[in-house]
A protein has these predicted regions:
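Glutamate identity and glutamate-enriched acidic tracts
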Residues: 1, 42, 88, 131, ...
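Feature captures outer-membrane beta-barrel proteins of Gram-negative bacteria and organelles
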Residues: 33-40, 56-65, 85-94, 114-123, ...
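Outer-membrane beta-barrel translocator/channel fold
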Residues: 75-89, 99-115, 132-146, 166-169
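Repeated loop/turn-to-beta-strand initiation elements of outer-membrane beta-barrel proteins
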Residues: 43-46, 67-72, 93-100, 124-130, ...
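Non-transmembrane, interaction-prone segments in cytosolic or luminal domains
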Residues: 52, 60, 71, 119, ...
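Transmembrane beta-barrel domains of Gram-negative outer membranes and organellar outer membranes
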Residues: 1-105
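Residue-identity detector for threonine
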Residues: 8, 20, 24, 57, ...
Length: 181
């Protein structure tokens, strides 16, 4: 009913550099081709892909200096309305972490979605945090919210529990437990 082939060639191991060709022939869907490339070392990771419809995807992560990582994710599509860009920066301090994110930011009319997170460790097993979200999808629409979270860690770090609350009345509880090594 069809065939699929993925051909990957590692051109270098340090830094890592590889290319991939993926083919799909016949079957229920149409024939398809995708080209991908990956490059990375201890400070950067770059990944990109191009398909036969002209869609380009990319992901770039860059360690600027200890504790600071900048990230870019994007998709560019020939069909209107399907492209997006996400810009992000993580900072990991000794007892806190911060993250800033912009989704489809526009410098001309300041539209987009902007998110800031902060998590502060209060004891070795307990942390509190907040998330601010500013949504401005079009010049006529604006909305800002602030949510809160708490994180508890087991004495031997064998479990993690979190609680999150958003002002729209949304609450979320999570629990993770390590069962074995």
């Amino acid at each position: 009913e069809g065939a699929r082939a993925d051909l990957t060639k590692a051109l270098s191991m340090n830094p890592i550099f590889q290319v991939t060709h993926a083919f799909t022939l016949g079957g229920a869907g149409k024939n398809a081709y995708n080209f991908g490339a990956v490059y990375g070392d201890e400070k950067r990771f770059y990944q990109a892909g191009l398909d036969d419809a002209g869609n380009v995807t990319m992901r770039l992560n860059r360690l600027l200096f200890p504790g600071h990582i900048s990230k870019i994710q994007a998709q560019f599509a020939p069909a209107g309305g399907q492209s997006f860009v996400q810009l992000e920066h993580d900072f990991q301090g000794s007892d806190y972490s911060m993250n800033f994110k912009a989704l489809n930011p526009s410098p001309t009319n300041l539209t987009g979605i902007y998110v800031a997170n902060y998590l502060q460790t209060l004891t070795p097993r307990f942390a509190l945090g907040a998330e601010a979200v500013y949504q401005h999808p079009s010049p006529e629409i604006e909305e800002a919210t602030v949510g809160y979270m708490a994180k508890w860690v087991g004495p031997a770090k064998e479990w993690i529990a979190t609680a999150q609350w958003q002002p729209q009345g949304i609450a979320q509880l999570t629990y993770w437990h390590q069962l074995s090594e």
